[in-house]
Regions:
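Compositionally biased, low-complexity segments
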Residues: 5-8, 29
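N-terminal export signals
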Residues: 77-98
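All-alpha RGS (Regulator of G-protein Signaling) helical domain and cognate RGS-like helical scaffolds
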Residues: 39-43, 49-73, 83-84, 98-415
């Protein structure tokens, strides 16, 4: 997607789903065996599959009544059996927990998992950079801050909190990669873009918020039963093309409507970024080989979803305004498809059209929500305007590696 041409097929990001298939590393089942096969094996003698321990556990439950009526020795014997059964059902990594009660970790992770976490670290670094620019403005009283507070009085602290969360994500992911003896990510060589001329903090940036093409199709998507993964497309709730989401001149030179339009643009941009992160994390989680990587990806995803829901609600509070120079924010409640109080994800098509509609994140396919799709989408919004060719090569190299990651159990291996 290029410039302001934004269709749902290239808007690659958005919301949260429980993964039904577990990764198959040391902590998971090897191969492609399904649950029915496992249950069948559980009843066979001598099976060493983890599911076979369920058979032993069922045997122990039959002893509960009699064991507690046969005195102390019987109870001790029963408790020993119960402990052994529990240990058998427990993932091996938990049995290796240190004496301080801390849960252990594997010595390392697969290269595919590392590629996934590296791209997510890069995405978080970029997110942190853009959120920091918003924080720099709202931490100072100004007409822009007042316009954001006109949307919701808590906008400044919400922005600060979101910024802090992104810092925590980037720092954790890179620290974890180092802990796993994997290469971390640094984009500092590309911190070359200028701040807004009127930013309270003048420092080189990675992202550009001064010429934004803000996708607002998510506002319709989550209020519809359609799903991009099934080919459904959506228009724009508001047409925001080549507009700043932060002030770019002395704020006294803006009219009241103009500064409100800039604040409204920011509000929709907040949600656009976070719905995208939600879809990205969900899509890449399905490629994780280890339970450890899966835990990290889905846990951070939950934070992204929480962010999106806040900003989805706040964007709906953006007042109708005409900037006077071509940007119009309509009264969204005049359109049944954009009712502002419909903030919960409407049930939509999911997995198969012959199944009931389900409230989920969408899209979640690699084609529409994977790393390359996410990088392509962000580039189309103007977020990287002014960046070097080397930046784009580095970003898309990381993205391609993440998308190529394969759950190792899908090929009969393990991490």
């Amino acid at each position: 997607m290029v410039g302001a041409i934004r269709t749902e097929s290239s808007v690659s990001w958005v919301y949260i789903r429980t993964n039904l298939t577990l990764p198959c590393g040391r902590e998971g089942e090897k191969g492609k065996s399904n649950m029915n096969r496992n249950i069948h094996r559980a009843g066979q003698k001598g099976g060493n599959d983890s599911m076979s321990d369920i058979h032993h556990g069922a045997f122990l439950t039959e002893e509960i009544g009699s064991s507690f009526t046969k005195g102390k020795e019987a109870r001790r014997t029963f408790m020993k059996k119960l402990a052994l059964s529990g240990a058998a059902l427990m993932p091996a990594s938990y049995a290796l927990a240190d004496k301080g009660g801390k849960k252990p970790h594997s010595d390392s992770i697969s290269e595919g998992d590392a590629d996934i976490l590296r791209f997510l670290a890069a995405a978080e670094i970029l997110e942190t950079d853009l959120w920091q620019q918003y924080t720099d403005f709202v931490d100072v009283p100004s007409p822009y801050t007042a316009a954001l507070e006109n949307i919701d009085g808590d906008m400044p602290p919400y922005i600060d909190q979101n910024t802090n969360d992104e810092f925590s994500h980037q720092n954790f992911l890179n620290a974890f990669l180092v802990k796993m003896n994997k290469q971390p990510v640094s984009l500092e060589a590309f911190r070359t873009l200028p701040s807004s001329p009127v930013s309270p903090v003048q420092t080189p940036r990675l992202t550009n918020l001064m010429h934004m093409n803000v996708d607002t199709s998510w506002f319709l998507r989550y209020r519809s039963s359609g799903n991009p993964d099934f080919g459904d497309t959506f228009g724009q709730a508001v047409n925001i093309v080549n507009r700043p989401s932060i002030p770019v001149q002395n704020q006294a030179l803006y009219t009241g409507d103009q500064i409100q339009a800039i604040a409204n643009t920011a509000a929709f941009h907040f949600a656009m970024i976070e719905q995208g992160g939600s879809s990205l994390y969900d899509a890449l989680s399905l490629k994780c080989s280890s339970l450890l990587a899966l835990r990290i990806v889905t846990s951070i995803e939950g934070s992204e979803v929480a962010h999106f829901e806040i900003w989805n609600d706040k964007a709906g509070d953006a007042p109708a305004v005409d900037s006077g120079d071509g940007l119009v924010f309509p009264d969204l409640n005049l359109n049944p498809a954009t009712q502002t109080n419909q903030v919960m994800p409407k049930p939509c098509k999911f997995i198969s059209e012959d199944l009931p509609l389900c409230s989920v994140i969408r899209p979640t396919s690699i084609e529409l929500a994977g790393a390359v799709a996410a990088a392509t989408f962000l580039a189309s919004t103007g977020l990287f305007l002014g960046q070097s060719d080397s930046f784009f090569k580095a970003l898309f190299k990381l993205a391609a590696a993440a998308d190529k990651a394969v759950r190792e159990c899908d090929h009969g291996g393990h991490d």
